[in-house]
């Protein structure tokens, strides 16, 4: 009931903002945070952030065999269930038995993966619901099996399914051994059919989740995915793969509500962060991205599907040497809406397309046919974005003829070419609510006469 009452409050705030000024079309971040924190605190009758911090404390000796510590937390160590951690022996059975013990515990649990060891794992799923809260401490390294035949479900390697009140951290490394998979990608070898490769770490249907202080490298495909989750805090992540690795998104957010991603460094061969349909109330703060394809909303609307993303704020990002900076990408033929999106305080360095909306996205070998419908893009704010573009076109709005981009606000934008050379903006079917101090800017031929009056260069 608490969630329902607060959700109604949040909807009232959204509605009120939509009938106010142009700028208020996007929810005020401080107000959003107040409501978000209030939902968490009332739902669990305590300070949720303090609760997460308490569960995340490192135990002093992470090689101890199972015990109950002085705080009443049961410590379950995978070594006591037979894990070898030698990088040669599969440790799935030990991990599964340890998880079953942890998940059935009536008291809070620390699930410990000790340091200085390399645990070889086939495909594995840690399933809930569990009886109590669990903090998974990965101090060592988890290494994926390099045998493709070990993956009956090609969509995942490590997954947490329907686990509530979960913390995952410890500073260890998740190594997907993606080098085994990448050559078989249709993006590397265009003669091959396009097939899934596993996501290294998937959280599905998890509520009240914290993922903190982890390293992920060389994922088979996506590094970390949050799917159908609610109330997520992800921070202090280090994610890296080759710039030429296919589809290796850093953090992928799908159908997830109330998620905060912060203090994270990502360099991959695809989107640093990708936010797709069903996601709402997403905040990404202090993100370093590059190489990769930037921070993206989408893609949305593929296969003529309906897609919705709303209330997304990207604040304080540094994007270096990436294909794109901040991007919204939708396919022709889709429907739905991407709305109430903010890109604030972003520094670009040698980025091919620093600001881009692409409503004609086509990520396949064969050409995409022209279609009438499109996902509507509206109420997007770009504010305090500066830096250098690796190409002449620093701002690219390629919006739909039938469903143009609406309610676009740009303030304090300064993007130049290499060595300070002038850059350009290309703007098709875009309608502005305001544009102040924007370099480069759309030409008078690309926008209406009324919109031209909004510009204050």
From Swiss-Prot:
It is found in: Secreted, Extracellular space, Apoplast; Secreted, Cell wall. Optimum pH is 4.4-4.8 at 35 degrees Celsius. PG1 is resistant to acidic but not to alkaline conditions, at which PG2 is released from the beta subunit. One of its GO terms (molecular function) is polygalacturonase activity. Induction: By ethylene. Its EC number is 3.2.1.15. The active site is at residues 270, 293. The keyword Transmembrane helix does not apply. GO terms for cellular component: apoplast. Expressed only in ripening fruits (at protein level). N-glycosylated. PG2B isozyme has a greater degree of glycosylation than PG2A. Catalytic subunit of the polygalacturonase isozyme 1 and 2 (PG1 and PG2). Acts in concert with the pectinesterase, in the ripening process. Is involved in cell wall metabolism, specifically in polyuronide degradation. The depolymerization and solubilization of cell wall polyuronides mediated by PG2 during ripening seems to be limited by the beta subunit GP1, probably by recruiting PG2 to form PG1. This is Polygalacturonase-2. It comes from Solanum lycopersicum (Tomato).
């Amino acid at each position: 009931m608490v969630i329902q009452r607060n959700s109604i409050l949040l909807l009232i705030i959204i509605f009120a903002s939509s009938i106010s000024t142009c700028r208020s079309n996007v929810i005020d971040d401080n107000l959003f945070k107040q409501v978000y924190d209030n939902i968490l605190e009332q739902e669990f009758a305590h300070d949720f952030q303090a609760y997460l911090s308490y569960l995340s404390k490192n135990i002093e000796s992470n090689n101890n065999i199972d015990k109950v510590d002085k705080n009443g937390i049961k410590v379950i160590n995978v070594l006591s269930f037979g894990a070898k951690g030698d990088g040669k022996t599969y440790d799935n059975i030990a991990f599964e038995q340890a998880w079953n013990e942890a998940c059935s515990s009536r008291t809070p649990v620390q699930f410990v993966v000790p340091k200085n060891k390399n645990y070889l794992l086939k495909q594995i799923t840690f399933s809930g619901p569990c009886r109590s809260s669990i903090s998974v401490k990965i101090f060592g390294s988890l290494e994926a099996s390099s045998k493709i035949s070990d993956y009956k479900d090609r969509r995942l390697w490590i997954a947490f399914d329907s686990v509530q009140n979960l913390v995952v951290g410890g500073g260890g490394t998740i190594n997907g051994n993606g080098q085994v998979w990448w050559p078989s990608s249709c993006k590397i070898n265009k003669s091959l059919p396009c097939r899934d490769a596993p996501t290294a770490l998937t959280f599905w249907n998890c509520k009240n989740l914290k993922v903190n202080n982890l390293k992920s490298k060389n994922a088979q495909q996506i590094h970390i995915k949050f799917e159908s989750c609610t109330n997520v805090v992800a921070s202090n992540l280090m994610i890296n793969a080759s710039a030429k690795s296919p589809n290796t998104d850093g953090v992928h957010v799908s159908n997830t509500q109330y998620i905060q991603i912060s203090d994270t460094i990502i360099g991959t061969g695809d989107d640093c962060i990708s936010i797709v349909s069903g996601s709402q109330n997403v905040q990404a703060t202090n993100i370093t991205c590059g190489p990769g394809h930037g921070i993206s909303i989408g893609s949305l609307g593929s296969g003529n599907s309906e897609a919705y993303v709303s209330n997304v704020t990207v604040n304080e990002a540094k994007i270096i040497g990436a294909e794109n900076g901040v991007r919204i990408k939708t396919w022709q033929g889709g429907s739905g809406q991407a709305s109430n999106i903010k890109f604030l305080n972003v520094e670009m360095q040698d980025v091919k397309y620093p600001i881009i909306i692409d409503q004609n996205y086509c990520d396949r070998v064969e050409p995409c046919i022209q279609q009438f419908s499109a996902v509507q893009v509206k109420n997007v704010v770009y504010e305090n974005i500066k830096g250098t573009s690796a190409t002449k076109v620093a701002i690219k709005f390629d919006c739909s003829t039938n469903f143009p981009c609406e309610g676009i606000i740009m303030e304090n934008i300064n993007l130049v070419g290499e060595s300070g050379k002038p850059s350009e903006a290309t703007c098709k079917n875009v309608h502005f609510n305001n544009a102040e101090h924007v370099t480069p800017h759309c030409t008078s031929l690309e926008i209406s006469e009324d919109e031209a009056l909004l510009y204050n260069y």
